[in-house]
Design a protein with these regions (language model features):
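Short, Lys/Arg-rich flexible segments
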Residues: 1-153
Length: 153
C-alpha cells in the first residue's frame, strides 16, 4: 500500500468516529471544494491527468456559417456553472455531478459516445474528454480539509 492509501484508510476510520451531523458538515465542505476544483480544471480545458481536451472537429466552410466565434471559445463554459455542476453530501457520502440536460451532454463527452448534435441530425461520435475525475492534488487537498475539520471538531 502507498502512503496515500494508508492516509485515506486512516481518514475513513477517523470520519466514521465523528457523529452524523458533524460528518455531514465535513463532507459538505469537501464536496464544495471538489466541485470548485473540478470547475476550475474544466475551465483550463484539461483532463484529470493534465492533458488538454481533444480539440473540436473542424467544420467545413459554408456560406451560412457565422464567423466561427462560438467555436473559438472554450468548451463546456456553461457546464461548469453551479446550476449544472452540482455538489452535495449526506452524512455518509459526498458527491459532485451534473444535473438535468447537462448530465446527458457531459456523459457523452466523458465516455466518448455517439450523439446527435441537433434534433434530426446524424449522430456524431464525440472525442473522449474526461470532465469529472480526481487528481492527486485534489485528493491531497480533500485529506487536508478532512484533517483540518477533524481538528476543529
Amino acid at each position: 500500500m502507498s502512503d496515500f492509501a494508508d492516509m485515506e484508510a486512516l481518514a475513513g476510520a477517523l470520519l466514521r468516529r465523528v457523529d452524523a451531523g458533524e460528518r455531514g458538515k465535513i463532507l459538505r465542505v469537501m464536496a464544495r471544494t471538489l466541485r470548485s476544483s473540478q470547475s476550475a480544471r474544466i475551465a483550463r480545458q484539461q483532463d484529470p491527468d493534465g492533458q488538454p481536451f481533444a480539440a473540436r472537429k473542424a467544420q467545413p466552410p459554408g456560406r451560412l456559417r457565422r464567423g466561427g466565434t462560438i467555436k473559438r471559445k472554450a468548451m463546456f463554459r456553461k457546464l461548469r456553472n453551479t446550476s449544472n455542476l452540482k455538489a452535495g453530501s449526506t452524512d455518509t457520502e459526498a458527491w459532485v455531478g451534473f444535473s438535468g440536460r447537462a448530465a446527458r451532454i457531459a456523459r457523452v463527452h466523458q465516455e466518448g459516445l455517439e450523439d446527435a448534435p441537433a434534433k434530426g441530425a446524424k449522430p456524431v461520435r464525440y472525442a473522449r474528454r474526461v470532465l469529472l475525475g480526481d487528481t492527486e492534488a485534489e485528493r491531497q487537498a480533500l485529506l487536508d480539509i478532512l484533517f483540518a475539520q477533524l481538528v476543529k471538531a
